[in-house]
Structures are given as C-alpha cells and as structure tokens.
C-alpha cells in the first residue's frame, strides 16, 4: 500500500521500471489541447495496466460481480471500462492518448487523441448513462469538429457528438477519417 501523502515523484523509478517492462502505460495530462499534443503535456498522468484482465485479477473481484453486476461494484466498473478503452486505443487503433482537465478540475475528458490535423475528445461511460457534462464543457470551450463518447449505448451520431459503443472502438479511426 502507498503511504498517505505519497506523490508520483516518490515512485518515479518504480513507475519507469514498470513502463520499461511494458506492464503499465501512462496517459499524460494536457495543459492545453493543441497540436502537437506532446508539446502541451504537463506533469499530471493516469496509469493503466497492460491488460484489463490484469486489473480485474488484481482487484480480486468475483467473476459473478462482473457478469451480473452489483451495486457495490458500480464505481470500479468505471475504472475497468476506462482501462479497456485505454488498451483499445493503444493496441487496436495505434493511438497515443492524452487526457485533459480544466484548471480547477471542474471537468475532465478521459482521453484526447490526434488524428491527422484534428483533435478528438473521448469520454468513457460504463453504462448507458449518456450524460457527458465534461465532454460538453470541453466542446463548448474548444469547439472540436466532433466529440466522441463510448458507452454501452448504441451507435448514434448527433450534431456535435458521436456515441460509439464500447464494442465498436475498432471503428474509431474510420469514423474520424470520414470527417476529414
């Protein structure tokens, strides 16, 4: 367990070792969503395991909870879903995702990626709850060509938003290319 008040710099060598071994991936926070993305990286980051199965196994979560759902499992379901999407973005789409959060952390977009000369925000939802307040805040502030939400809901395209089902993430690049 981590000691209270621990900071990322306290674990810098361990984190680098896990990255070098390919066991974790870091998704870097952007100070500003602009091209090229790495130029606007700041010190914040999220860590994801190599595989969503590892996260499930490490959590000690009972398989029945995963299959049937459980109220006690609802918060962790979001973490598992975000892990799955991070894995899909890297492996299936070959993208290097970043993330964005507002200055006072009033809004956060789970992933931000570049395709061609466009930036796309991607919000992840574990259920069919389609409220994406942070995504709307981002859209209103930065006016991307399209905002993307991936959830358990069906494929749906609206004026400013594409809902791409979690099982359809392999189509992400093709969907973005149709806009260019």
Report each predicted region and the residues it spans:
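Accessory nucleic acid-recognition modules appended to NTPase machines
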Residues: 1-115
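Short, flexible loop segments at the rims of nucleotide/cofactor-binding pockets, characterized by
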Residues: 2, 124-126
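Intrinsically disordered, low-complexity Ser/Thr/Pro/Gly-rich regulatory segments
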Residues: 62, 89, 174-180
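Short small-residue beta-strand/loop micro-motif enriched in glycine and branched aliphatics
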Residues: 67, 120-121
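Short catalytic-loop micro-motif centered on adjacent basic/acidic residues
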Residues: 98-99, 121-124
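Structural motif
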Residues: 118-120, 146
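Catalytic cores of nucleic-acid endonucleases
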Residues: 126-166
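Helix N-cap / beta->alpha transition motif
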Residues: 162-176
């Amino acid at each position: 367990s981590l000691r209270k008040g621990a900071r990322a710099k306290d674990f810098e060598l361990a984190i680098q070792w896990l990255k070098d071994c390919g066991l974790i991936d870091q998704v870097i926070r952007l100070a500003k969503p602009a091209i090229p993305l790495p130029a606007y990286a700041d010190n914040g980051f999220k860590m994801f395991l190599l595989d969503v199965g590892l996260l499930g196994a490490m959590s000690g979560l009972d398989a029945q909870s995963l299959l049937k759902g459980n109220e006690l499992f609802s918060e962790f379901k979001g973490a598992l879903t975000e892990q799955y999407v991070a894995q899909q973005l890297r492996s299936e789409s070959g993208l290097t995702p970043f993330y964005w959060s507002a200055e006072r952390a009033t809004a956060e977009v789970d992933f931000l990626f570049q395709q061609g000369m466009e930036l796309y925000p991607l919000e992840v939802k574990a259920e069919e709850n389609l409220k994406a307040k942070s995504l709307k805040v981002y859209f209103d502030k930065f006016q991307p060509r399209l905002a993307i939400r991936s959830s358990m809901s069906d494929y749906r395209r609206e004026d400013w938003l594409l809902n791409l089902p979690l099982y359809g993430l392999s189509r992400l690049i093709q969907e973005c290319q149709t806009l260019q």
